[in-house]
Amino acid sequence: MNNAVKEQLAELGIEGYLNQHQHKSLLRFLTCGSVDDGKSTLIGRLLHDSKQIYEDQLAAVHNDSQRVGTTGSRPDLALLVDGLQAEREQGITIDVAYRYFSTQKRKFIIADTPGHEQYTRNMATGASTCDLAVILIDARKGVLDQTRRHSFISNLLGLKHFIVAVNKMDLVDYSQDRFEQIRAEYLEFSKHLQGETEIQIIPLSALEGDNVVEKSRLMDWYQGPSLLELLENVDIDRDKSSGAFRFPVQYVNRPNLDFRGFAGTIASGVVKVGDKIKALPSGKTSTVTRIVTFDGDLPQAQAGLAVTLTLADEIDISRGDLIVLESAQVDSTNHLLADVVWMTEQPLQVGRDYDIKIAGKKTVGQVKAVRHQYDINNLSTYHAESLPLNGIGLCEWTFTQTVALDKYLDCADTGGFIIIDRLTNVTVGAGLVRDSLQNITGQTESFSAFELELNALVRKHFPHWQAIDLSRLGKA
């Protein structure tokens, strides 16, 4: 038991502590930035100064600091996060490391992401579940290519809150001029980011603890809050509940003949008993009669809650369908534009079939064309025929089924999909819907009947050849 928990138990008692803890909001955030900007040290300092470290953990850090530490005689707090042996020996982060802690105001899950360009896929994976990004900048080096790259990926993945932490201020004598110079440089770069992003910029020193949990006496020219205060007070619940109601059906719950409900997690918005809804892609309508949870029925439910909805009418709804309000305008298409983050050594192939999972629905899709690939260091684009490992590009997709979806920036759960290799069942990429295109319905005779039959035979008996389906290349 750490000191923070001991203090809260002594003040509130067990029942009071559990009740308070249960009703705290949860903030998921990631730390990112260039190599050696101090991401792991910052998390270690945050955990240490907020009294979240157990005594045996602190003792282990003291011992490990003598062997692989980088802070001299002082304990290397980065070792609280860098768990892999290779990370500790190299002094870098390779995998995404997750840490949990809580304060009296809020619960937190931290994703410590790697800074190296070859681990872009790891960083994208960490960002996909977060609400906020803490982007570190070394006060000595300023805004680097990797800073721009991580800002771009975080923005691409829909994060609407950035805290830019100008770290290592102790190494520039806590200079206000240097901080203002970096602040102006980053704000100028941020004009190229899409959507509305709330950006807070703060000077700190993770090694010394300045402006991490407590305000710094050495930077009295900075009048804003500390990092922990910013994390405790950022409003993320408004973002989740302000969107349109989206409910991807994960399971049809039929325990007996008298009950039929549709289970899932509300992706965005709010639903109330009595709301008129429609199911997509069928378009059938009904009315919500109950909102069932483990703790009993609710009059209304908002984004993030796992619920079971019962309806007034027996309409056909199955796993993968999307329930929305009757008045909602939702795109249903099999043809779309999506940004793709590629995560495997074998490049993305135009025309090859991949399994697609989007909001509980499974279908098959293929890339008709790569519109462009991003240079994620300077946000420019260039022509590409495919996407390599860690490549990010805008692709034109076709699916075998019509899918109800949103733009990723509007709703991540119904606008994001994963791409799976059909032979190995390995997740090879992630897609972020940019826009829907006109449905593809027709097919032209581009190949002879013999060519199509031979192609089907090869794909059936020699799947490891990964032959392209010719019958789909002729779709208009």
From Swiss-Prot:
Q: Where is this region: G3?
A: 112-115
- Segment G1: which positions? 33-40
Q: Which Pfam family, any one of them, does this sequence belong to?
A: GTP_EFTU_D2
Region: G4; residue ranges are 167-170
Boundaries of every tr-type G domain copy: 24-240
Please list where the region (G5) is annotated: 205-207
Which pathway, per its entry?
Sulfur metabolism; hydrogen sulfide biosynthesis; sulfite from sulfate: step 1/3
Q: Which GO terms describe its molecular function?
A: ATP binding; GTP binding; GTPase activity; guanosine tetraphosphate binding; sulfate adenylyltransferase (ATP) activity
The catalysed reaction is:
sulfate + ATP + H(+) = adenosine 5'-phosphosulfate + diphosphate
What exactly does this protein do?
A: With CysD forms the ATP sulfurylase (ATPS) that catalyzes the adenylation of sulfate producing adenosine 5'-phosphosulfate (APS) and diphosphate, the first enzymatic step in sulfur assimilation pathway. APS synthesis involves the formation of a high-energy phosphoric-sulfuric acid anhydride bond driven by GTP hydrolysis by CysN coupled to ATP hydrolysis by CysD.
Q: Which family is this sequence assigned to? A: Belongs to the TRAFAC class translation factor GTPase superfamily. Classic translation factor GTPase family. CysN/NodQ subfamily.
Quaternary structure note: Heterodimer composed of CysD, the smaller subunit, and CysN.
**UniProt-listed NCBIfam families:** CysN, PRK05124.1, small_GTP
Identification of the protein by name: Sulfate adenylyltransferase subunit 1
Q: Which gene encodes it?
A: cysN
